[in-house]
UniProtKB/Swiss-Prot annotation:
Belongs to the argininosuccinate synthase family. Type 1 subfamily. It comes from Shewanella loihica (strain ATCC BAA-1088 / PV-4). InterPro entries: Arginosuc_syn_C, Arginosuc_syn_N, Arginosuc_synth, Arginosuc_synth_CS, Arginosuc_synth_type_1_subfam, AS_cat/multimer_dom_body, Rossmann-like_a/b/a_fold. It is found in: Cytoplasm. PANTHER family: ARGININOSUCCINATE SYNTHASE. GO terms for cellular component: cytoplasm. The lineage of its organism: Bacteria, Pseudomonadati, Pseudomonadota, Gammaproteobacteria, Alteromonadales. L-citrulline binds at residues 96, 101, 132, 136, 185, 194, 270, 282. This is Argininosuccinate synthase.
Length: 407
C-alpha cells in the first residue's frame, strides 16, 4: 500500500498525549494530514505528578481531540514492571536504573488497549527520530498490535523547532501555555525524572542547580544522617520504617525520605540504542534505596554461583529493557528464571542516608547463608582449617600442571 493510500485508510488514531507543545501540535497535524481523521488522546498516569495531569482533558479537547482517556497505571507500573526488573539486578551500563525504559512497555500496552476499546486503526507517538523511545514504543506496538498503523510525526513533518510548533498552533488559533524558551527536556514517573538538553549537551558543563527537581542538593542536605528501615518479601518492598505499603506507596515514601538527603542523582553519558551517545541527568531517590536494600539482602542469601548468574542475567535484562524488548520470549524467560532467586530475598535492611549517599548498615534475613560461627577467626567445631590444604591443591591443580609442562 502506498503512503498516500495508507493515510487515506486511517480513520481513528489514539495519540500518546502529554499536553505539552509537541503533542498539542500533533492533534491538528494528524487531522490535516490524515484526511480529517478522529483523534483520541491517551495519557498514562505513571506517577509524573498532579501538575502534569491538571487540565489535560480540557486541553486535549481544545486542541481537536474527540476524547481523552487518562489511565491510572501507577500501581501496575511499580508492581509488574519495576519490581520484576530490579529483582533481576538490572542496571544499564553500571549506573542507570532504567526509569524511562521501564515505563515505556506499560504505556504502549495501555495505549493499544485504548485503541482496541475505541476501534482505532492507528496509534501515534511524539518521540523524536533521534531517540530511544521511538524504538521502544514501536517495538511494543509490533509485539502487541502488528495490525495497527503507527504514526510518528517527527519523522514526517517539516517542523524542526519549538518556534515552528508555536507558530503552527498560533496559525490555527490553538492556545498553549508553552514558550519558545524551554531549556530542558524532562520525563518523569514514579521511579525517576530525567533531564536532558540545555547546557547538559556539553559534557564539560556541570549541571546547574536548576536541573534538579526531585532531590535536594547533597551539600544542602541535613548535616545529620537519617536511618530508614526497609523490609522485603521475595524482592518486593513491603514495609518502610515498620509501616506497610502497596508497591507504589512504598516507592513514594522512599522518594520523599531519600530525596530530602540528595540520594539518587546521577550524571551519565550513555550509549543510546540508535547508535549515538547522549548525556542525561537522572534522579531516582527511592529507587536507589530499594536497589541498595536488594543488594544487601542478596549478599546474605545468595551463594557465589547464584550471584554470578544473577549478575549475568541482570546485565542482559538491562539491555532488553533499555532496548524496548519487554514483550519478547527472552525477556519473559529471564523474568521467569530469576524468580526462584528473587523468592529468597526476604529480610530487613537499615540504610544510612547522608549527603547524597545511601549505605546499608544493618541487614538480616531468615534465608541468610552467613554464619558468625563459621566466619569467625576463632576456633569452631564445624570448619577445620587444615581441610583447606587439600581444597587448595585441587583448586590450583590446573596452574600446577601448566607450570610443570613449561619446565
Amino acid at each position: 500500500m502506498s503512503i498516500e493510500n495508507n493515510k487515506a485508510s486511517v480513520k481513528k488514531v489514539v495519540l500518546a498525549y502529554s499536553g505539552g507543545l509537541d503533542t498539542s501540535a500533533i492533534i491538528p497535524w494528524l487531522k490535516e494530514t490524515y484526511d480529517n481523521c478522529e483523534i483520541v488522546a491517551f495519557c498514562a498516569d505513571v506517577g509524573q505528578g498532579e501538575a502534569e495531569l491538571e487540565g489535560l482533558h480540557e486541553k486535549a479537547i481544545a486542541s481537536g481531540a474527540s476524547e481523552c482517556y487518562i489511565v491510572d497505571l501507577k500501581e501496575e507500573l511499580v508492581a509488574d514492571y519495576i519490581y520484576p526488573t530490579i529483582a533481576t539486578g538490572a542496571i544499564y551500563e553500571g549506573t542507570y536504573l532504567l526509569g524511562t525504559s521501564m515505563a515505556r512497555p506499560i504505556i504502549a500496552k495501555a495505549q493499544v488497549e485504548v485503541a482496541r476499546k475505541v476501534g482505532a486503526d492507528a496509534v501515534c507517538h511524539g518521540c523524536t527520530g533521534k531517540g530511544n523511545d521511538q524504538v521502544r514504543f514501536e517495538g511494543c506496538f509490533a509485539a502487541l498490535a502488528p495490525d495497527l498503523t503507527v504514526i510518528a510525526p517527527w519523522r514526517e513533518w517539516s517542523m524542526v523547532s519549538r518556534e515552528d510548533l508555536l507558530d503552527y498552533l498560533a496559525e490555527r488559533n490553538i492556545k498553549t501555555t508553552a514558550s519558545a524558551t524551554k531549556i530542558y527536556s524532562r520525563d518523569a514517573n514514579a521511579w525517576h525524572i530525567s533531564h536532558e538538553g540545555g547546557e547538559l549537551e556539553d559534557p564539560w558543563n556541570e549541571p546547574s542547580k536548576e536541573v534538579w527537581t526531585m532531590t535536594v542538593a547533597p551539600e544542602d542536605a541535613p548535616d545529620e544522617p537519617e536511618y530508614v528501615s526497609v523490609e522485603m518479601e521475595a524482592g518486593r518492598i513491603t514495609k518502610v520504617n515498620g509501616q506497610s505499603y502497596t508497591p507504589y506507596g512504598a516507592l513514594m515514601a522512599l522518594n520523599e525520605i531519600a530525596g530530602a538527603h540528595g540520594v539518587g542523582r546521577i550524571d551519565i553519558t550513555e550509549n543510546r540504542l540508535v547508535g549515538m551517545k547522549s548525556r542525561g541527568c537522572y534522579e531516582t531517590p527511592g529507587g536507589t534505596v530499594m536497589f541498595a536494600a536488594l543488594r544487601a539482602i542478596e549478599e546474605l542469601v545468595l551463594d557465589k554461583t547464584s550471584r554470578e548468574w544473577r549478575e549475568q542475567v541482570g546485565a542482559k535484562m538491562a539491555h532488553l529493557v533499555y532496548d524496548g524488548r519487554w514483550f519478547t520470549p527472552l525477556c519473559e524467560s529471564l523474568l521467569g528464571a530469576s524468580q526462584p532467586l528473587a523468592n529468597l530475598l526476604n529480610g530487613e535492611v537499615v540504610l544510612k542516608l547522608y549527603k547524597g549517599q545511601a549505605q546499608a548498615v544493618k541487614k538480616r534475613s531468615p534465608n541468610s547463608l552467613y554464619s558468625e560461627e563459621f566466619a569467625t577467626f576463632g576456633e569452631d567445631e564445624v570448619y577445620n582449617q587444615k581441610d583447606a590444604e587439600g581444597f587448595i591443591r585441587l583448586y590450583s591443580l590446573a596452574s600446577r600442571i601448566r607450570a610443570l609442562n613449561v619446565k
